Amino acid sequence: MGKLGKKARKFAKKNLQSVEKRSRKLKPFIKKKFAKRNERHQAGDKQEKKVEQQPKKRCQEEEFQDIAIDAVFGKDDDEVLRDGDSDSDGYLDELVNETDSDIMKCKVLSRSFLATCCDMVDKEQYVPALVRLLNWYRAACQYGHEPSGIARPNIYYDIEDSETFAKVIIFVLQKADHTFRSILGLSDSSTKEKILKLKNNPKWDSLKPLVKSFFRSTLHLVKQAGDLEIISFTLTQLRVSIVFLAAFPDLLKKLIKISVHLWVTGEETISQQAFLILKDISMVFNSECFDSCLINMYKAFLHDCDIPKANSEQRPFLRDSLVELCSQDVQKSYTKASVSITQLAKLLKMALATKNKEAVEKIHSGEYINCVDLWVNFISANVQDCDLQPLLYTIVQVINGVAQLIIGPRYLLLRVKCIHWLNHLSRTSGIFIPIASLVLDMLEYKTTNDGEKQEQKLEAVSTVKLPKNWLKSQNFQEQCIFSVIELLAVHFAQWSFHISFPDLATIPVMRLKKFHERSTMEGLKRVVKRFIEQVESNIEFVQRKRDDVTFSPNDQQSADTFMQLEKQNANAPYTQYYQSIIDKALGTNKKKKK
């Protein structure tokens, strides 16, 4: 068939539907087929980017679930190496330096034989007698935790009675350190460097297994003993010999792990003794063990804070002792604190952005709140002696964010705690931190007085979120206003003699006057009125002094020395008023504890 003419093609294009349909199908195919290769690649890349960008928000939400406050320092350092730390070594070989042929076959410790061995060790540092004592000491420490009978081939270790049992433990704990040092010729002030140099001492080769046996048995006793007095006595005696652990790094790690556990979970005396051991370890071994002690204590502290307890009076001690350890090496602790506070800020930022229920609960958890409390106290303890301004700025931003995350009367306690933190940081650093707006917002809480009167004080409530029945109680607003007065009194007391005090106190006084006018509770009105009168009196006092000055407002040095003499006067009216409020608060706390 020949080619159609021009007129025929024109007719077909206009009138035949099949031709139009086919051309429409082929047109995009032809364009795609002959498109430039680079353009096709670019189009593909754009599509891939769109696919990748879609779940971005979802990834952020999932990322929040993976953030843990106690995971910022990496893995635990509390795993103990098993080589040389297991109990498979058994008892010491009693043939060391022994030429006697009549070695006891039955190893039963009697009172008379114990007295003989103790006398030989105490006066002569006789090594074979020390070996026997350490074997019986090990048997006593392992009592009830290993099968009775033959512990080694053809050798049986046993103790005659309970009195002998107690004496062998007490004697070894009291005399072992002195005996080791006497044999090696070491003084009581020997450092870990001297212990490490003992490798070249021939006496050390024969004494090292004895020292190791003593520590292994003692650590087992501390870990397994159920009597608090035995544990306390053992920890006290163990502190003297810590320097010897330089030769046994595995046992040193095990001691850190056991001490951290006792520090967190032990009774008050045990907890204090365990902390002293951790403190001594970090001082004796410096950088080698400071990080390990700090990280393990930090994680144990946060884990304990996340567990609800009926009695949480020990937590201030745990916090203060951890702050004390951090203060031993502020430079290293600064790095850890910076990482931890940054993590707190990330969690808060996510919670503020999403207002997700789980995110808010994370911020209000005991772990988060106590972590903030820890670093607030660390900064306050060291801000005068060290440059901690970056940490101070960041933690203040975090505290302000926590206070404003959810505003409402049920979160009154959390807001009060946040303001206490800010007042504490301001007082210790000498830097002005505004808190008036956070305090005065508490005046606007709408409450009713329909419920029963609560006998419990606000400070005694352990939860962050108040129960609903508290909001309807008769004295909730009363306790709320008392908190406002106390917080403002502390804030004003710091700046009561500053040249800018009239400007600082004017707006809070105006807000308090409005509250005084609309309040119908006479008891509250009297308290608020007295506070207003005291503040206004101090405003007038500072204003009169300020009117007499001759220096410029730009003269910062003169402004800082303003009213320094008056500041030292404890009889100033506002100072006395502030002291009465503090005394009243302290008296309330004492009654609560009783």
UniProtKB/Swiss-Prot annotation:
This is Protein REBELOTE. GO terms for biological process: floral meristem determinacy. Keywords: Nucleus. It is found in: Nucleus; Nucleus, Nucleolus; Nucleus, Nucleoplasm. 'Rebelote' means once again in French. It comes from Arabidopsis thaliana. A motif (Nuclear localization signal 3) lies at residues 512-519. InterPro entries: Noc2. The keyword ATP-binding does not apply. The lineage of its organism: Eukaryota, Viridiplantae, Streptophyta, Embryophyta, Tracheophyta. A motif (Nuclear localization signal 1) lies at residues 8-15. Residues 1-13 have a biased composition (Basic residues). Residues 36-58 have a biased composition (Basic and acidic residues). Belongs to the NOC2 family. Interacts with SWA2, NOC2 and NOC3 in both the nucleolus and nucleoplasm. Binds to ENAP1 and OBE1. The keyword Ribosomal protein does not apply. A motif (Nuclear localization signal 2) lies at residues 35-42.
